[in-house]
């Protein structure tokens, strides 16, 4: 069979196959079969070297004409098939306007953020400034400046995430207080809210990451009475005028004397329930008068100035306020839970 006859035969067969193609996959198969690197038309073009000088231009011209015809037909059928596939897809995906729509979820503040904002608002109204500091903290500010020496059990790797020997993930927001005292002379009146980190196993009451808010007041002639008055006022603003408070002796290395403040259970109003374990009282915070050594470490003369400090676990405040019995619920992003707040 002459080369011209082969080309005409390829053209006729290809046009028949193109006309019968119904989908994109079939069209691609035809394109490869005739025009691909190993296609029938390409094979003929590669064999032109065996033709005589007189035949080459004739066969070359015919081969190019066949290629142009096939490419044009393939392009036309491709457009037609794609449009048909598009219309079929639209037909199958038509929206039934009688069906109920999907409700859009509207974001809002997490209960932790809500409680933090409420606490900050109360303290700002009492004249406190809000201070911030690094979460990756120097060992000195997290421990030594706060009267926690190198052999203190709180510095154990079981309780603290160490980056290296001199850097930790802060275990409290107290380092912010130390940094402020170094840079600012009294009077100082500040709170430092933020995330802290402890090497705790996750359970219903413990999390390796949680929120704290700590406060500090330094000035001349500050007494424990000032501490009590400040925290009692906060409790009334936070939980209502009927709340009662009491202070119990405790120990913290950075305050002396130290105490814990309890408030009447705001679930049962002091009558006793499962939240307060039948006692009618709930532990709210730790507090005390700033230890003289802490003042010295931060460049403040304890013979001239005194002060008090306090600290809340914000997660605990949220749990107590809303009667939540598992801290993990605050971090699981379950909208069924979060939509209640």
Curated annotation (Swiss-Prot):
<dbReference type="InterPro" id="IPR045864">
    <property type="entry name" value="aa-tRNA-synth_II/BPL/LPL"/>
</dbReference>
<dbReference type="GO" id="GO:0016740">
    <property type="term" value="F:transferase activity"/>
</dbReference>
<dbReference type="InterPro" id="IPR004529">
    <property type="entry name" value="Phe-tRNA-synth_IIc_asu"/>
</dbReference>
<dbReference type="GO" id="GO:0140096">
    <property type="term" value="F:catalytic activity, acting on a protein"/>
</dbReference>
<keyword id="KW-0648">Protein biosynthesis</keyword>
<dbReference type="InterPro" id="IPR002319">
    <property type="entry name" value="Phenylalanyl-tRNA_Synthase"/>
</dbReference>
<protein>
    <recommendedName>
        <fullName>Phenylalanine--tRNA ligase alpha subunit</fullName>
        <ecNumber>6.1.1.20</ecNumber>
    </recommendedName>
</protein>
<keyword id="KW-0030">Aminoacyl-tRNA synthetase</keyword>
<keyword id="KW-0547">Nucleotide-binding</keyword>
<dbReference type="InterPro" id="IPR006195">
    <property type="entry name" value="aa-tRNA-synth_II"/>
</dbReference>
<dbReference type="GO" id="GO:0006432">
    <property type="term" value="P:phenylalanyl-tRNA aminoacylation"/>
</dbReference>
<dbReference type="GO" id="GO:0005524">
    <property type="term" value="F:ATP binding"/>
</dbReference>
<dbReference type="GO" id="GO:0005737">
    <property type="term" value="C:cytoplasm"/>
</dbReference>
<dbReference type="GO" id="GO:0000049">
    <property type="term" value="F:tRNA binding"/>
</dbReference>
<keyword id="KW-0479">Metal-binding</keyword>
<keyword id="KW-0436">Ligase</keyword>
<keyword id="KW-0067">ATP-binding</keyword>
<dbReference type="GO" id="GO:0000287">
    <property type="term" value="F:magnesium ion binding"/>
</dbReference>
<keyword id="KW-0963">Cytoplasm</keyword>
<dbReference type="InterPro" id="IPR022911">
    <property type="entry name" value="Phe_tRNA_ligase_alpha1_bac"/>
</dbReference>
<feature type="binding site">
    <location>
        <position position="256"/>
    </location>
    <ligand>
        <name>Mg(2+)</name>
    </ligand>
</feature>
<keyword id="KW-0460">Magnesium</keyword>
<comment type="subunit">
    <text>Tetramer of two alpha and two beta subunits.</text>
</comment>
<dbReference type="Pfam" id="PF01409">
    <property type="entry name" value="tRNA-synt_2d"/>
</dbReference>
<dbReference type="Pfam" id="PF02912">
    <property type="entry name" value="Phe_tRNA-synt_N"/>
</dbReference>
<dbReference type="InterPro" id="IPR004188">
    <property type="entry name" value="Phe-tRNA_ligase_II_N"/>
</dbReference>
<comment type="similarity">
    <text>Belongs to the class-II aminoacyl-tRNA synthetase family. Phe-tRNA synthetase alpha subunit type 1 subfamily.</text>
</comment>
<dbReference type="InterPro" id="IPR010978">
    <property type="entry name" value="tRNA-bd_arm"/>
</dbReference>
<dbReference type="GO" id="GO:0004826">
    <property type="term" value="F:phenylalanine-tRNA ligase activity"/>
</dbReference>
